[in-house]
């Protein structure tokens, strides 16, 4: 997805007040892809144990069924930019909405384990598309003065999607009397959990018809008047629209369609800035954040918490995730991206260390001792809070901003794919690692959180307040 932005001379660093509400609506509609991203990613949390028992599978096979969606995510993220540059951002969103719908229906009504895995791959492809198209589209329609905050809508939508999925799972479990395989209208509870995603998927598709195409894409295919009209909608009549159109066209003439070859450097394969993007993406996942959203119900049950309470704690964790994201949205354009990243890394490292200590205790009657159990619950929530107010938001903002125009599309796709591959590695390995040593697993995650601190200090540059043309 190739995007450009106005330079400082354009006078468009802030939207006209009359148009900011319209820009917010457009951003929120596009961020519905993020909502589905969060919902589809974490809804499986409520079905893990039911799938294990329904198909009588061990931890290794179970992990592959859960993690296989991430293969689709990586493919979707790698190809979405090229698809969007060819057919447009809106059409890309509509394709993703259809795939989300198909995945929801198929996952709720699987014939066997193999087709459940297939439906999850399809849903993963849609998630991967949404992970790239959402931030890029939002960056293209957002005035620079608001770009950080509007860019945060994507992560806000993701965490709201996570929270809603956990709330829906908890509600369905209550209806099924606490049994994930309890019958509701002929289907097991876990099938309803996966099938409910049809509702937001259809809403996403409908909203995509209510928002305009990116003016930058329209200019790239020669639709100058349509692009001019949309720029007027999002930036106001007081802006010199002819100058803005000329400015974008000039920037587009200076750049070319990015390809994988453009990312190659003389040392270590990729250009240094691409490695920084990959590093940000990978560190975001290697701290183990998605263990909290894919396996938390199973994790709490493994240390003696009953199923209903484990679902409730999964929901409270997702609420903390929302609170942290709101904090990040408020601070990202005030204190900058790097300070948030460093604060988050420090907080996560400490919280993960406490979790590792708590899980090192021997179980008493199948439960953690009271002190360790309390510490584990508090530390898990603190970990999610520090992730949400930092890496959960700033990585997406960085990836939308940090690359030069000439390589942005390809670099964003590679970085997003790296994120999904790292996510897959953590998701696929956790059940086996937990069987090996739960405390040791959290020590590994704490080490990655600690290593992210020198990485940010040495390699990551601040992007706060810069126009996209200044990057790289």
Q: Predicted regions: what is each one?
A:
Residues 1-226, 230-232, 252-472:
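Alpha-helical transmembrane bundle of multi-pass membrane proteins
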Residues 234-236:
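Short helix/loop segments within enzyme catalytic domains
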Residues 238-250:
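Short, well-structured alpha-helical segments
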